[in-house]
Protein backbone atom coordinates (compact mmCIF):
# COMPACT_ATOMS: atom_id res chain seq x y z
CA UNK A 1 0.00 0.00 0.00
CA UNK A 2 1.33 3.45 -0.90
CA UNK A 3 0.62 6.84 0.62
CA UNK A 4 0.21 9.95 -1.47
CA UNK A 5 -0.23 13.19 0.49
CA UNK A 6 -3.74 12.96 1.96
CA UNK A 7 -4.84 9.52 0.77
CA UNK A 8 -3.68 5.95 0.44
CA UNK A 9 -3.80 3.91 -2.72
CA UNK A 10 -3.15 0.31 -3.59
CA UNK A 11 -2.44 -1.29 -6.96
CA UNK A 12 -3.90 -4.79 -7.32
CA UNK A 13 -3.35 -7.17 -10.22
CA UNK A 14 -5.52 -9.89 -11.72
CA UNK A 15 -3.75 -13.17 -12.47
CA UNK A 16 -3.55 -12.25 -16.16
CA UNK A 17 -1.97 -8.87 -15.43
CA UNK A 18 0.46 -10.35 -12.89
CA UNK A 19 1.56 -12.99 -15.40
CA UNK A 20 2.32 -10.28 -17.96
CA UNK A 21 4.17 -8.06 -15.48
CA UNK A 22 6.35 -10.94 -14.21
CA UNK A 23 7.80 -11.09 -17.72
CA UNK A 24 7.88 -7.30 -18.20
CA UNK A 25 9.12 -5.69 -14.98
CA UNK A 26 10.14 -2.56 -16.91
CA UNK A 27 6.53 -2.06 -18.05
CA UNK A 28 5.31 -2.61 -14.46
CA UNK A 29 7.61 0.19 -13.26
CA UNK A 30 6.39 2.48 -16.06
CA UNK A 31 2.80 1.68 -15.09
CA UNK A 32 3.39 2.42 -11.41
CA UNK A 33 5.07 5.71 -12.33
CA UNK A 34 2.12 6.63 -14.59
CA UNK A 35 -0.39 5.92 -11.80
CA UNK A 36 1.65 8.06 -9.38
CA UNK A 37 1.71 10.87 -11.95
CA UNK A 38 -2.07 10.68 -12.41
CA UNK A 39 -2.79 10.65 -8.68
CA UNK A 40 -0.35 13.46 -7.94
CA UNK A 41 -2.23 15.67 -10.37
CA UNK A 42 0.87 17.70 -11.20
CA UNK A 43 1.04 16.87 -14.91
CA UNK A 44 -1.64 14.28 -15.69
CA UNK A 45 -1.50 15.25 -19.37
CA UNK A 46 1.86 13.44 -19.56
CA UNK A 47 0.05 10.12 -19.13
CA UNK A 48 -1.78 8.72 -22.17
CA UNK A 49 -4.93 7.50 -20.44
CA UNK A 50 -8.42 7.09 -21.90
CA UNK A 51 -11.73 5.87 -20.59
CA UNK A 52 -12.86 2.75 -22.45
CA UNK A 53 -16.26 3.11 -24.07
CA UNK A 54 -18.98 0.51 -24.44
CA UNK A 55 -19.82 -2.28 -22.00
CA UNK A 56 -16.58 -1.78 -20.10
CA UNK A 57 -17.25 1.92 -19.53
CA UNK A 58 -15.87 1.88 -15.98
CA UNK A 59 -12.45 0.74 -17.25
CA UNK A 60 -9.53 2.90 -18.33
CA UNK A 61 -6.45 2.16 -20.35
CA UNK A 62 -2.95 3.56 -20.10
CA UNK A 63 -0.75 3.46 -23.17
CA UNK A 64 2.87 2.56 -22.42
CA UNK A 65 4.65 2.43 -25.77
CA UNK A 66 3.39 -0.66 -27.59
CA UNK A 67 1.62 -1.95 -24.48
CA UNK A 68 -1.77 -1.19 -22.98
CA UNK A 69 -2.78 -1.62 -19.35
CA UNK A 70 -6.50 -1.81 -18.57
CA UNK A 71 -7.56 -0.89 -15.06
CA UNK A 72 -10.53 0.12 -12.92
CA UNK A 73 -10.56 2.51 -9.97
CA UNK A 74 -12.46 1.63 -6.81
CA UNK A 75 -12.96 4.63 -4.52
CA UNK A 76 -13.30 4.81 -0.78
CA UNK A 77 -10.90 5.65 2.02
CA UNK A 78 -8.34 3.72 0.05
CA UNK A 79 -8.14 4.19 -3.69
CA UNK A 80 -7.70 0.76 -5.25
CA UNK A 81 -6.34 0.52 -8.77
CA UNK A 82 -7.47 -2.91 -9.98
CA UNK A 83 -5.25 -3.83 -12.92
CA UNK A 84 -7.32 -6.01 -15.23
CA UNK A 85 -5.14 -6.73 -18.28
CA UNK A 86 -1.77 -5.82 -19.69
CA UNK A 87 -0.10 -6.71 -22.95
CA UNK A 88 0.48 -5.69 -26.55
CA UNK A 89 -2.21 -3.43 -27.98
CA UNK A 90 -4.02 -5.96 -30.17
CA UNK A 91 -3.97 -8.72 -27.56
CA UNK A 92 -5.43 -6.55 -24.80
CA UNK A 93 -8.42 -5.40 -26.81
CA UNK A 94 -9.16 -8.97 -28.01
CA UNK A 95 -9.05 -10.28 -24.43
CA UNK A 96 -11.40 -7.52 -23.26
CA UNK A 97 -14.31 -9.13 -25.09
CA UNK A 98 -14.19 -11.98 -22.55
CA UNK A 99 -14.36 -9.70 -19.50
CA UNK A 100 -17.53 -9.41 -17.43
Where are the model-predicted features located?
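Enriched for short, Lys/Arg-rich terminal
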Residues: 1-4, 8-11, 64-67, 72-100
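A short, surface-exposed loop/turn module that caps and links secondary-structure elements
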Residues: 37-61
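A short linear boundary/processing microfeature
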Residues: 23, 27, 37, 89, ...
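Short alpha-helical segments used as structural interaction elements across diverse proteins
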Residues: 25, 29, 47, 58-60, ...
Amino acid sequence: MLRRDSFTYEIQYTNAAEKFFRKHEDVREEYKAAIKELLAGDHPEKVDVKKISGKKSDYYRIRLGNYRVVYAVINGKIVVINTILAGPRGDVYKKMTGLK
